Amino acid sequence: MRLPRFLSVILLGLEAALAESTQKWSIQDFKTLVTFGDSYTDDTRISYFINHNGSAPPVGWVEPITNESASGGYIWGHFVHQYAHLSHRYNYAVSGASCSNKITPRATSFGLYPSVLEYEVPAFTADNAYHIPSTGEKFLQNDPDSTIYSIWIGTNDLGNYAFLTDSQVANNTIPDYIDCVFNALDGVYKAAKGKYFVIMNMVPLQLAPLYATPENGGIGANNYWPDKSGNFTEISYRMWEQVSTVNQVYDYRTPFEWVVGKRYPGAKVAVMDMYSLISDIYYHPQQYLNGSAPANVTGYIHHCNVAGSECETLSSPDSFLWYDQLHPSQRTDEIIAEEFIKVVKGGSEYATYWS
């Protein structure tokens, strides 16, 4: 029996995509990193919004770098900059961000958290077109041949007060969030003529204390989810299902867009498998965590009451996978940075490459 022509075309395209996946790419002269995302990536951009009544930083704003990120110290991008001896790093990630406020808007003290699609990509686009008045020099030093663009978004989209609790905007589904990620990449690709992209997939959020089962260190009501209630095991398994679904979609959607659909001509992409990397730390902590205390993957360093007004920070931070109930620790971010550089060089076991 002959296959319909359209099915034959799709199968041929997917076969070509699978062949392409074995062809790793590497950037020979990695000088600049441009990042988009949420608190897993933000340095201090959210602080500007908080300190300026919700107003965004002006075009050409230089983000200060401090060791007060959501990791409890420096964020992974800082360590990539340091370890790879980069010339430039530009970080557009904002703590609290989702991919789009038209899908999963999240409220904060000044309104809605800025999102990737509605704020971060336009901010980058404006900076990319900006020239410093005093010198006429281009603000962003992002030559396409030496710049990596990364996006790591979804923790808030899939979490409480979003898809996990059915709080998304009506008639939106998880595939809409995936569409948003590629729409964001469209904007970056168009503005910068980017050649190298890294999509970082979802970590195993069902193992984070905020969403874990009780026997795996899961917690009840807390400062990130004050009204958490119900069956915590059911919550954890639903999160697991969501994360697994998203990552499987990335696995087939990315080669489709790059190889079959030719959506990004001339560009290359790696999907960095954050799920497997964090799982390896979780299940083999002695190989990764090097604090003075025993390795701890179910607990966390920074504990606060439900109001968030009283907090305690434990000692030996390098012993922990998690800084708080949701965010990886600085030690984990160091590991992420080391692996990210391997991804860029084409030598990571945690990446699939497409071009």
Locations of the language-model features?
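Fungal secretory targeting signals
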Residues: 1-27
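Signal-peptide-cleavage-adjacent N-terminal segments of secreted and extracellular proteins
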Residues: 18-85
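Extracellular/periplasmic catalytic domains that process cell-envelope and extracellular macromolecules
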Residues: 26-29, 82-86, 139-145, 149-151, ...
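Structural recognition of the beta-strand scaffold that forms the well-ordered cores
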Residues: 32-36, 40-44, 88-93, 147-152, ...
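A solvent-exposed, charged loop/short amphipathic helix patch at secondary-structure junctions
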Residues: 48-65, 160-174, 213-237
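Conserved SGNH/GDSL esterase-like catalytic core that processes O-acyl groups on lipids
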Residues: 60-176
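A structural motif corresponding to the C-terminal end of an alpha-helix
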Residues: 79-87, 184-198, 234-235, 241-271
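Mobile gating loops/cap/lid regions near enzyme active sites that modulate substrate access
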Residues: 204-237, 262-327
